[in-house]
Each structure stands twice: as C-alpha cells, then as structure tokens.
Amino acid sequence: MERFSLRFVLMMVSIILTSSICQAQLSPTFYDQSCRNALSKIRSSVRTAIARERRMAASLIRMHFHDCFVHGCDASILLEGTSTIESERDALPNFKSVRGFEVIDKAKSEVEKVCPGIVSCADIIAVAARDASEYVGGPKWAVKVGRRDSTAAFKALANSGELPGFKDTLDQLSGLFSKKGLNTRDLVALSGAHTIGQSQCFLFRDRLYENSSDIDAGFASTRKRRCPTVGGDGNLAALDLVTPNSFDNNYYKNLMQKKGLLVTDQVLFGSGASTDGIVSEYSKNRSKFAADFATAMIKMGNIEPLTGSNGEIRKICSFVN
C-alpha cells in the first residue's frame, strides 16, 4: 500500500512539473533571437486586413477563442479537410461562421519569407487576436509565444459542446469556462469581445420573437427589421448598435438596458447572479474591463499549448507537413 502511495505521489509530481515546464516554454520573448521580425510581420498583415474590412478584428479574436476551446491553442482550427483529417471548420459551431483564415495564411507567408519553419500558426492566431484588439481601440497585451501546431483536427470534439451554444444558460457557460481553467470574471470579460463584430439572424431570431421580459421592446422591434420570422437566416446584425466598430465597454451598458443581442449575452445580467456585479462594474469602468480582458486573453491563450517537441511547425497553416 505504501509503495502504491509513493508511486501515486511521484506520478502527480511528474504531471505538475510537466505542466509547469509547458507554461515556462511560452514566453513573450520566445522569438527574440530566432525571428525578431515575426511579430511585426504579423501585425502588418493584421492591420492591412482590418483596414480593408473592419469586421475582421472581431473575426480574428473569435478564431483564437474557437481554436483554444477545442483541444487547446494548437491551430487545429486552420486545418482543411483531407482523406485523413475531418476539419474543425466544418463543425457546426464553426461552419460558415469562423472566418479570417486568409489573414492568418497571409501573415504566415510573410513570416516564412524571413524565418522559414520557425513561427507556428498557433502563435500567429494568438498574436493576430491581440493586434486586432489594439487596432480597433481595445487593450494590448504581451502575448506568450512558443506554441507548436497540431498534426490533427478535432471536428467531433468541436461538435460535442466544447464551444458555447447560442442558447446556453449562465450555468452552462460558467461550467464550460471553468473546465478550461477560466473563472466567472474571465467569462464576463471575454464576452466583452462582442462589443465589436456581427451575428447572423438565425442565432438571435428566437430571442427577438419570444416576447421575453429580458429584452427591451424597442430594441427587439429595431432588430426585427433585419431578421424576419422566416428567411434571412444569414442576415448580419451588429452585436453593438451604438459603437459597432469600436472596442469599448458599451456592450455592458447594453446588457444593463436589456439590449444584448444574443441569449448568451443577456444571461450575464439580470438574474441576480454574481455576473451582474461584474457587468455593472465594466459598464462604469472601461479601463477595468480592458485590463481584465487582456488578462483573460492571456489565460485563454495558455489552454493546453503544444510545446517542446510536441506537434510541429507547419509550413502551410491549412495542412500538416
């Protein structure tokens, strides 16, 4: 029995040490010697893309989220389908929804010109999300880099509840985020990414027409113009009508007025849960929201990264080597 206990303790120590080593291998200075121009190349590609289409900022932040929540931040979301790979792009939460792949491809090609085989696609996604936030007036943070790319995709996992559903309850959202090592404040802060971007009609139609007490009547009436009861499933609507292209704290002010577009937005405020206080705090203090958003993005970027000799550095982000 004592021998078994000792083996168990040693095994747990090994797991903890391995986890610590993985985190230690991620560093903001990871490419300082091997590819010092990497981050500037990525930044240039991102800024060019958002200057062309403002909506792309939200898309790049969302891509990072959808990558990290399915099997960790490993760029598995970028892989196209082949005879041996079922692409996450085709999973229900991502299909014709996640976008910005061409921006990542462009950034990768620019980096490859100066540092071939050095910078991972997973790191490019993470850096692009930060640069997108900064470009539209949001916070900037030091991205920890050193991730490697997966050699597989995880479509079945993406379809199995690893990503939030558009009708999830607060308890479901909190449970999902907790499973990823993120707390309630992280949930509310990361949801603030919906201060920019757009959503498709079919994702919020039911909320508009259910005549619920948690939606402002005037807001619902305005939104119905672009989202009829039948048809128009793909019609786009700004998540924040007031400042749709600026990364500010207006999203939280909207929630307090029952003007959250998605069910998963509005569940953050109005039920008397602990999230109410956080939403109220962010609505009054943009700087606090920005700081907490940056902290949460760093934490999210540390979800199960591949490091060391695990995975690979893809030559082309959409295919394994």
Swiss-Prot record:
GO terms for cellular component: extracellular region. Disulfide bonds join C35-C115, C68-C73, C121-C317, C201-C227. Ca(2+) 2 binds at T195, D240, T243, D248. Ca(2+) 1 binds at D67, V70, G72, D74, S76. InterPro entries: Haem_peroxidase, Haem_peroxidase_sf, Peroxidase_pln, Peroxidases_AS, Peroxidases_heam-ligand_BS, Secretory_peroxidase. It catalyses: 2 a phenolic donor + H2O2 = 2 a phenolic radical donor + 2 H2O. Keywords: Calcium, Disulfide bond, Glycoprotein, Heme, Iron, Metal-binding, Oxidoreductase, Peroxidase, Pyrrolidone carboxylic acid, Secreted, Signal. The record marks R62 as: Transition state stabilizer. Its EC number is 1.11.1.7. GO terms for biological process: cellular response to hypoxia; hydrogen peroxide catabolic process; response to oxidative stress. Its main location: secreted. It is found in: Secreted. The active site is at H66 (proton acceptor). It comes from the Eukaryota. The keyword Magnesium does not apply. Glycans are attached at N211, N285. GO terms for molecular function: heme binding; lactoperoxidase activity; metal ion binding. The modification Pyrrolidone carboxylic acid is found at Q25. Heme b binds at H194. Gene3D superfamilies: 1.10.520.10, Peroxidase, domain 2. Belongs to the peroxidase family. Classical plant (class III) peroxidase subfamily. PANTHER family: PEROXIDASE 5, PEROXIDASE 72-RELATED. Removal of H(2)O(2), oxidation of toxic reductants, biosynthesis and degradation of lignin, suberization, auxin catabolism, response to environmental stresses such as wounding, pathogen attack and oxidative stress. These functions might be dependent on each isozyme/isoform in each plant tissue. There are 73 peroxidase genes in A.thaliana. This is Peroxidase 5. The gene is PER5.
